[in-house]
Amino acid sequence: MKKMVNIGFIKMGNLGMSQVINLIQDEIAAREGITVRVFGTGAKMAPADAADTESFKQWNADFVVIISPNAAAPGPTAAREIWKDVPCIIVSDGPTKKEAREAFEQEGFGYIILPVDPLIGAKREFLDSVEMASFNADAMKVLSICGVVRLIQEELDKVTEQVASGKSGKDLELPHIFAKPEKCVEHAGFANPYAKSKALAALHMAEKVAQVNFPACFMLKEIEQVCLTAAAGHEIMGAAAQLANQAREIEKSNDTVSRMPHAKNGAVLKKVRLYEKPE
């Protein structure tokens, strides 16, 4: 009999992927063999917020996923220090430099770095709650349709299966993935090459958003420059979401949408035609 697997998610701040990462292994709430709990610090991700995650250790997770923007920032760094004695996977939009990622691996952490999870235009002059939610909805369209959700789901399932089979602690093989657009789109299961090309374009656009929004968030001072630049970044994200939708519509029109639901026992099933059963 396989072990019940406790999977903990620590959400510090917010990425696009933060919205669903704790749901993607049990999409219809019918999977047996796993229990999921989430500790969130809201929009903030300071060292003081990281310190509060210590109490989550009482739940005794078999492995933990820490998701946050910029894993090299002080808050996420403090969280890693707290959780270094538990198998831990870092999910973040950075650092993107190879040396920094290798340092995570040397310290025993798994990681999935997502340069395609875009930086929001987080300036009071531009961003309110409605704009924030709209941007995240656009980001989720790209992350879901274009392969990012499935990539992460597959990697978390691999670690879950190891725990269920009796592995634990340092014996677990954790992912070490830099998820560039070309890698992500290969997980989306597109049958039509034009659909795949639209999805790849959407991922490249999502990656570009951070390059546009970074100056608006951290460098520009004049209100016109800040607002124009942040608005441009959000327009790129909206256009990327439209391309992602177009890609899925092509697959739907050909009845070739790739679906990979979980069986009750956690096995991943597959189907393509709308009216066929997943097997």
Swiss-Prot record:
Alphabetical keyword list: Methanogenesis, One-carbon metabolism, Oxidoreductase
Reactions that this protein is recorded to catalyse: 5,10-methylenetetrahydromethanopterin + oxidized coenzyme F420-(gamma-L-Glu)(n) + 2 H(+) = 5,10-methenyl-5,6,7,8-tetrahydromethanopterin + reduced coenzyme F420-(gamma-L-Glu)(n)
Catalytic EC class: oxidoreductase
EC number: 1.5.98.1
Gene3D superfamilies assigned to the protein according to its UniProt record, in alphabetical order: 6.10.140.120, F420-dependent methylenetetrahydromethanopterin dehydrogenase (MTD)
Family listed: Belongs to the MTD family.
Protein name: F420-dependent methylenetetrahydromethanopterin dehydrogenase
Organism annotation: Methanosarcina mazei (strain ATCC BAA-159 / DSM 3647 / Goe1 / Go1 / JCM 11833 / OCM 88) (Methanosarcina frisia)
